[in-house]
């Protein structure tokens, strides 16, 4: 099973978590057709209770609300810690023009989130991932061919420097790590290159402790037609299924206007993950047999931010994908043009 998730939004780097029986995706946002990753300035959250109907909760954090950052709001993650929801994200620091890992807080899993500032003790804090088990929290991050992990201090404002581990030599990771647990093993999934050649493939390594050491296990998302060059994602169990979320260029054909993907994965008895077979590319517009709804009734208007945008499979007469962008002030409504092409 492989599906495109919410094809009306261009987004990437999905981090999946289940809170109170609902699946949430925390994603970076691709500004459509800008032909650069430098234009990424905000994050969205999406959620579902059935893997079919998705709610886009809208913008959960924007660059304009992060005083220390200037650009490059790339990959993120989120998790629940001591009754609050925390977002770990990365951006270029205004003082150094290098990546730092930021921390933001919310009372709700769908946000919006409020920036708390950078996490101390993290060098080149690109692509942070946030793992919680019991009374311990971990930060995993990576970029420029390195992946590192450390235990958070209790307030999440810094990491315990004595716990920092560089995992790069053992697993040959490139960036974008994510940690999940299956049975008694910890699975670190991450993008990797084959002899420094692009595109990236999704690899994984396992350990008996979150801090490692990790053993490389192989590739479970190989190169496929319609990839976006990069691949970044997560793995989660939901309603009895193990699911991999990642991004591709299946809808736009562009590496900078990416689409969210969902594939079911299977584990063998020895714990290995069966490689996915993604051999079908969808050219141009895709038929999703659903109506895309911008549901203003559940979307409080706040300074141009639209929250609670709903994607629903309530109809079978819509066969395209679109997006609404560029809202800068509070409005009562949005007009959307729909064009229907007849057979022949």
Where is each model-derived feature located?
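Carbohydrate-active catalytic/glycan-binding domains of CAZyme proteins
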Residues: 1-302, 308, 312, 317, ...
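Extracellular carbohydrate recognition and processing domains
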Residues: 225-227, 316-344
């Amino acid at each position: 099973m492989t599906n495109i998730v919410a094809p009306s939004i261009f987004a990437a780097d999905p981090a999946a978590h289940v809170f109170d029986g609902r699946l949430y995706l925390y994603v970076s946002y691709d500004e459509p057709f800008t032909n650069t990753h430098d234009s990424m300035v905000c994050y969205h959250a999406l959620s579902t209770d059935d893997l079919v109907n998705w709610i886009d909760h809208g913008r959960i954090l924007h660059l304009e609300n992060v005083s220390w950052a200037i650009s490059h709001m790339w990959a993120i993650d989120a998790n629940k810690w001591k009754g609050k929801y925390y977002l770990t994200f990365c951006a270029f620091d205004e003082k150094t023009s290098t990546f730092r890992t930021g921390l933001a807080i919310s009372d709700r899993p769908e946000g919006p989130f409020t920036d708390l500032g950078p996490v101390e003790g993290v060098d080149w804090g690109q692509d942070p991932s946030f793992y919680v088990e019991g009374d311990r929290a971990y930060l995993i991050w990576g970029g420029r061919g390195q992946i590192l992990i450390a235990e958070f201090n209790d307030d999440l404002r810094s990491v315990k420097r004595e716990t920092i581990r560089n995992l790069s030599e053992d697993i040959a990771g490139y960036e974008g790590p994510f940690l999940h647990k299956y049975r008694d093993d910890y699975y670190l999934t991450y993008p990797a290159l084959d002899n420094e050649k692009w595109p990236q493939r999704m690899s994984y390594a396992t350990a008996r402790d979150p801090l490692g050491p990790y053993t490389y296990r192989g590739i479970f998302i190989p190169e496929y037609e319609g990839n976006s060059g990069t691949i970044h994602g997560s793995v989660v169990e939901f309603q009895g299924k193990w699911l991999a979320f990642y991004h591709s260029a299946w809808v736009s054909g562009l590496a900078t206007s990416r689409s969210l993907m969902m594939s079911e994965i299977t584990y063998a008895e020895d714990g290995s993950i069966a490689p996915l077979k993604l051999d079908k590319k969808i050219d141009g517009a895709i038929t999703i047999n659903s109506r895309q709804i911008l549901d203003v009734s559940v979307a409080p208007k706040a300074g141009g931010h639209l929250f609670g945008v709903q994607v629903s499979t309530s109809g079978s007469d819509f066969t395209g994908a679109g997006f609404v962008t560029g809202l800068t002030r509070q409005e009562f409504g949005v007009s959307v043009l729909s064009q229907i092409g007849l057979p022949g």
